[in-house]
């Protein structure tokens, strides 16, 4: 007891007496000032600046004069080391953090009980925790001010705001009251909230958010569902994706052609035998025979069409040939008179310049089947006197013989 009193006296001598009394009465003044802060809507709505100034006034000598007597009573009943003074003053966040958004003020809340090392300060620690909770609600965890202080639960005030921000504080609080997992929304990155890299609570929240994202992706929000894959497989089976073509060897093709020449249709036992001997499946043999039959039918049909066209051409050619022969026979029948007239014209021109002997030879050659009378009659004008018959007596050409 003596050591503690001497330690307290030495600590009090380091500062002025009125300030020492005010610092000892700081916890009670802090509790009363922070408890009255949320009731005033003007302070709560103004953000963290007004509350920090009011809290700083509670540590100033001006507010310590009104509460000097309760401070002496508290000092006499529960002595505490001067470390508690710095702890209570450390409950309030720094103005730099408040200007950035007030995210670090709540982070200091859970860390403050670790500063209390004396076992006799349990009541002061409880009061400090309540003051920190009230201060976190009054200061607000984001620029919402009074909305954030009125709507957020006590857990968010004690453990600090997670990395993921809320679009609407009231809706987030309502969702958080219904289900704890719904209080975490998808991340909306904001630079106004300084996140401590070594904060285990925020790292846990990030891990939980990653787990939620993985579950949502596997549920079908990002990855395609299994029915999509099954529908693609069904569409491929319907004919969009063709199977690879079977490559038969020359020996297999020869044997298949031989079997096809023997029989165009294979029975089931024969098909099994051929497939086993050629190391093929029955389906491959069946499909090959189907394709070969279609090819054979096409070639057969093409041959039949070619034969029909040839017959048609022969029929049209035969009719044209018959007509030509008839025309030739008519020309042959009508031809000799025409040729005779032409020949007679030529003969009349030739007789004027040719000898009578040659004319007789030509006439005999031209009419081989005529008798001599006809020949002489035809050439009577051009015949000689020796060949002509003697004139009758008393005729026009009779001349008396000289005596």
UniProtKB/Swiss-Prot annotation:
DNA-binding region: 241-300
Region annotation Disordered: where it falls in the sequence: 32-81, 299-403
Record-level GO cellular component terms: chromatin; cytosol; nucleolus; nucleoplasm; nucleus
Signal peptide annotation: none
Biological role stated in the UniProt entry: Transcription factor. Recognizes and binds to the regulatory elements of target genes, such as visual system homeobox CHX10, negatively modulating transcription. Plays a role in establishing motor neuron identity, in concert with LIM domain transcription factor LMO4. Involved in negatively modulating transcription of interneuron genes in motor neurons, acting, at least in part, by blocking regulatory sequence interactions of the ISL1-LHX3 complex. Involved in pancreas development and function; may play a role in pancreatic cell fate specification.
Gene from which this protein is expressed: Mnx1
PROSITE patterns: HOMEOBOX_1, HOMEOBOX_2
Name this protein carries in UniProt: Motor neuron and pancreas homeobox 1
Biased composition range(s): Basic and acidic residues: 302-314, 343-354
Subcellular location: Nucleus
GO MF, one example: DNA-binding transcription repressor activity, RNA polymerase II-specific
Keyword Nucleus: yes
Organism encoding this protein: Rattus norvegicus
Ranges of biased composition (kind: Low complexity): 53-64
């Amino acid at each position: 007891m003596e050591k503690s009193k001497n330690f307290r006296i030495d600590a009090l001598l380091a500062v002025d007496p009125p300030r020492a009394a005010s610092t000892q009465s700081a916890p009670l003044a802090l509790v009363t000032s922070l408890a009255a802060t949320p009731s005033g809507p003007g302070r709560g709505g103004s953000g963290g600046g007004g509350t920090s100034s009011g809290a700083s006034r509670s540590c100033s000598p001006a507010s310590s004069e009104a509460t000097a007597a309760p401070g002496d009573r508290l000092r006499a009943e529960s002595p505490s080391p001067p470390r508690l003074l710095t702890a209570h003053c450390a409950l309030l966040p720094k103005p730099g953090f408040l200007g950035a958004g007030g995210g670090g003020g709540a982070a200091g809340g859970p860390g403050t009980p670790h500063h209390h090392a004396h076992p006799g300060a349990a009541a002061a620690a409880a009061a400090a925790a309540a003051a920190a909770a009230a201060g976190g609600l009054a200061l607000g965890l984001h620029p919402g001010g009074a909305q954030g202080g009125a709507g957020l639960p006590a857990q968010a005030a004690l453990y600090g705001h997670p990395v993921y921000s809320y679009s609407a504080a009231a809706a987030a609080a309502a969702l958080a009251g219904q289900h704890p997992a719904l209080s975490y929304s998808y991340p909306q990155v904001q630079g106004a909230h300084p996140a401590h890299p070594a904060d285990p609570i925020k790292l846990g929240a990030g891990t939980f958010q990653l787990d939620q994202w993985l579950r949502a992706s596997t549920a079908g929000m990002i990855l395609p569902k299994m029915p999509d894959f099954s529908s693609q497989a069904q569409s491929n089976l319907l004919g969009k994706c063709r199977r690879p073509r079977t490559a038969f060897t020359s020996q297999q093709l020869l044997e298949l052609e031989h079997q096809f020449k023997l029989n165009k249709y294979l029975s089931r036992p024969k098909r099994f035998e051929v497939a086993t001997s050629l190391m093929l499946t029955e389906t491959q043999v069946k499909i090959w025979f189907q394709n070969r039959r279609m090819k054979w039918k096409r070639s057969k049909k093409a041959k039949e069409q070619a034969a029909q066209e040839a017959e048609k051409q022969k029929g049209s050619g035969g009719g044209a040939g018959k007509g030509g022969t008839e025309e030739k026979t008519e020309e042959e029948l009508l031809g000799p008179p025409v040729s005779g007239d032409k020949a007679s014209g030529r003969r009349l021109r030739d007789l004027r310049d040719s000898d009578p002997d040659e004319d007789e030879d030509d006439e005999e050659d031209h009419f081989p089947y005529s008798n001599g009378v006809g020949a002489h009659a035809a050439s009577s004008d051009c015949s000689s006197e020796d060949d002509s018959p003697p004139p009758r007596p008393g005729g026009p050409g009779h001349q008396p013989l000289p005596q």
